[in-house]
Amino acid sequence: MSSIKIECVVSETYKIGESPVWEEKEGTLLFVDITGQKVCRWDPSTKKVQSVSVEAPIGSVALRKSGGYVLAMGNTFSALNWEDQSVTTLARVDEDKPNNRFNDGKVDPEGRFLAGTMSQEIRPAVVERNQGSLFTLYPDHSVVKHFDMVDISNGLDWSLDHKTLYYIDSLSFKVDALDYDMKTGKSSNRRTLYKLQQDEGIPDGMCIDAEGKLWVACYNGGRVIRIDPETGKQIQTVKLPIDKTTSCCFGGPDYSEMYVTSACDGMDEDWKKRQPQSGGIYKITGLGVKGIAPTAFAG
């Protein structure tokens, strides 16, 4: 097996870095700073980060087929025009829950944008329970709710045959699997795939590799773990030099690099001194596996 190398490629510290997405056309990495209320784009060739500020906490960003990006921010699905930095609301959710905000999201293989909500954090990973839901934004901008009673809606991705949705509600400390109808975008038969061990931390963002295995970033666990959905077993752990790992995606010219976002929110001065690059973006190479290109929102 090739030797694994971990490096901090963006040392600017973000409060809650999240939602990394590789944009192949530009050769750049998109990500958000949730409470910093920014959409960011890092160019590996220049090592520079460009960012656009938005007016609400932003949980996730995705590519959009017609250009620009689609966002799950505040209680809205919105579109971002990167060139003029304008944001347009496409749909609203949870209007009866003013304390809720969107969190993680991802586009399914048919071009629908799924994202979930949670109540605003009292402090990191502490929320009013059962306030969140998982939603789909369809290309015609209609919205459907999959289920509610969620604590912190988080990582999601699809099996390589597109028949299974993998999903994380962080405070359940589990990775779940659901049957997924790719024709309709409906999900059913939710079940537990993997329960995290105590030392692994809180399951956060997630992505799938080209071998159909899941990679889960573990908040406060300082690691990404690889899970085999066939057996429900954890088969690999990659530890990072920071505790607050938040999400992961594959990228680079051939999708052989893994990018991991992190947070520094809630860390005291002593903790920050010990881990000064918390809130940075990390690149992991030498994993010996490649990822899958992200799908763009079709609407």
Swiss-Prot record:
Q: Does the keyword Cell inner membrane apply?
A: no
- Which family, according to the similarity comment? Belongs to the SMP-30/CGR1 family.
Q: What gene is this protein translated from?
A: rgn
Which SUPFAM superfamilies does the UniProt record give? Calcium-dependent phosphotriesterase (SSF63829)
User: Which tissues carry this protein?
Assistant: Expressed in the liver, and in the pronephros from the late tadpole stage.
What does this chain do? Gluconolactonase with low activity towards other sugar lactones, including gulonolactone and galactonolactone. Catalyzes a key step in ascorbic acid (vitamin C) biosynthesis. Can also hydrolyze diisopropyl phosphorofluoridate and phenylacetate (in vitro). Calcium-binding protein. Modulates Ca(2+) signaling, and Ca(2+)-dependent cellular processes and enzyme activities.
| Catalytic reactions of this protein | D-glucono-1,5-lactone + H2O = D-gluconate + H(+)
Cellular location of this protein? Cytoplasm
Q: How is the cofactor bound?
A: Binds 1 divalent metal cation per subunit. Most active with Zn(2+) and Mn(2+) ions. The physiological cofactor is most likely Ca(2+) or Mg(2+).
Q: What EC number(s) does the entry state?
A: 3.1.1.17
Task: Give the organism, scientific name.
Answer: Xenopus laevis
Q: What is this protein called?
A: Regucalcin
